[in-house]
A protein has these predicted regions:
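N-terminal "domain-start" segment that seeds a small globular fold
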Residues: 2-41, 64-66
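Eukaryotic short linear interaction motifs
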Residues: 36-38, 60-61, 97-100, 133-135, ...
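Short active-site neighborhood of thiol/selenol oxidoreductases, capturing the structured segment around
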Residues: 39-72, 89
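Well-ordered, non-membrane alpha-helical segments in soluble/globular domains
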Residues: 61-77, 104-108, 173
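Short, internal strand/loop/helix patches
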Residues: 88-92, 100-142
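Thiol-/selenol-based redox modules, centered on thioredoxin-like
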Residues: 132-137, 142-217
Length: 217
């Protein structure tokens, strides 16, 4: 089906189930914080709820902004602020053309000035590694279009969007972010040592403690 402005699919209203979700591929590229030493994306993504923007052109970047821009989706930024550091936004600029990649590097200083310093390690430029097989596996069917992925703490793709956002897709993304943040909080609580967990509950009577919920993988 052909969608408006290159949109290749409409997003689910609910999260993909954990046991059915595919993993987001590990990519390697430079960041605004590390322009000379490439970094792995998985090292940054693992352990946090992540909203990942994936794009390879200015047009595609403008499309992902309709999902994750502060003015286009203020509810998402409220979640970033209230649930930090459990949730983060990551930008991945895929630039396989050598000349365009060189131009991006030349103007990285402008992006550093524009972005919050906290976002510098979360802005990647990836030159290679995103093969056709990987693109197909994550639903990136049109390299000219921007894509947004919501990942859980184990780098599993729990939701995805493409092209310009529609109102119901923004709602689905934000609901998914809140749900994964809650899952992450429960996961962290289940991993607390017993003494620390009891201290956080404010009780010293083990019989009155609420049960610890352990999240299954």
């Amino acid at each position: 089906m052909r969608h408006h402005e290159g949109k290749t699919f409409r997003s689910n209203t609910r999260l993909f189930k954990r046991d059915k979700a595919l993993y987001f591929p590990n990519l390697n590229g430079i960041t605004l914080a590390s322009p000379k030493e490439p970094q792995d994306t998985s090292a940054l993504l693992r352990g946090k709820v992540s909203v990942v923007n994936l794009f390879s052109s200015v047009w595609a970047e403008s499309q992902v902004a309709t999902f994750t821009g502060p003015s286009q989706n203020p509810g998402l930024y409220e979640a970033f602020q209230t649930a930090s550091p459990l949730v983060q936004k990551v930008d991945i600029n895929v630039e396989e053309n050598a000349l365009k990649a060189w131009l991006v590097r030349m103007f990285m200083f402008r992006m550093r000035a524009k972005l919050d310093p906290a976002q510098h390690p979360r802005w990647f430029m990836v030159r290679k590694g995103l093969t056709e097989g990987l693109r197909e596996s994550i639903g990136m069917m049109n390299s000219k279009v921007g894509y947004v992925y919501l990942l859980d703490e184990n780098c599993r793709i729990r939701w995805a969007g493409s092209g310009p956002a529609e109102p119901e897709e923004l709602e689905a993304l934000n609901n998914g972010v809140h749900k994964l943040i809650q899952e992450k909080k429960i996961s962290m609580e289940s991993e607390l040592p017993a003494q620390e967990w009891e201290a956080r509950t404010g009780h010293d009577d083990s019989a009155s403690l609420k049960p610890r919920v352990v999240m299954k993988p």
